[in-house]
Amino acid sequence: SDFGDFLRSAGNTAPEDEPDLNKIHFNMDIFRAFAKGYIESAKSFLTPLEIEMLPYAVMLFPYMQAVRFLADYINGDTYYQIKYAEHNYVRTLAQYKLYQEARRAVPEMKEYISLLL
């Protein structure tokens, strides 16, 4: 989970509440650098299945965060601190866009991980 959550933040080319969705992309260079170091350190205790699932963790975390922001927005913004009325809604859209970008990158992430093993 640390792997996916780190890349939700570091792999995003924009802030998590970026209103301009065209600025949101998944940075594969950050993924490659982080995955290389992570797998080199963790492959001794991760199972092959856990390593295989790492790209899905990258995709899952922005999706989960989008759901959390949306739930908070619907429930009256009681959990996450907001700066303006639609802040959690904007965050929802931004995180969902990052999810879509990460989802498109899954084949490339899987290919890169296979080269590290």
Question: Where do the model's predicted regions map?
Answer:
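All-alpha amphipathic helical-bundle segments outside canonical DNA-binding/catalytic cores
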Residues: 46-58
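General structural signal for secondary-structure boundaries
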Residues: 27, 47-48, 110, 117
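Sparse, context-dependent recognition of short Cys/His-centered cofactor- or disulfide-binding micro-motifs
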Residues: 39, 55, 84-87
